[in-house]
């Protein structure tokens, strides 16, 4: 299985999957390709043994937003009506879920819609977790070839990468503030992977986190999954 197949397969396998009738809590993960990473993370951490997961995919070009009028955010060359929070099957799945986890490669243009989107989700009376965006800079295979492995965890980012990473940091802070105002838990995905930092090298604990700077390898998914598992354990123990 290549890196792209790894990212997408599990998400496709559980897309709008019906929940089993058992004592497990039912969790619906909604989002773009970052939701594929989140699905992989929870499975790598074995969270599926205690929770029943289902998924729904909305392309980043359409915006992962529960808002009817967001044409200014959508790619006009893409049929975003096919991927919408207003899909009847999705609404039914939300109603059958105990929790809804929403994640995206969030853009600055998403921020102005976020309050309305969260309002519409909360009307459905479900526990919501909002996950932030993440990025690890440009992945350049030549850099890894030309540098000793001992230096891989001290990767130096280009100016272009730093601009992108600081923009992601700014977006996550804005989402944190909005989430807090609605008493919704915000999960900073970047911090979970980067040990609380706003950005970190794409090499950790002996392997690569991301094959393209955006999406997680199995190693990266395991790191995120264990961090989420620990986070949920801490919440349950309070």
Model-derived features: positions:
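Extracellular/periplasmic envelope-modification machinery, especially enzymes
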Residues: 1-238
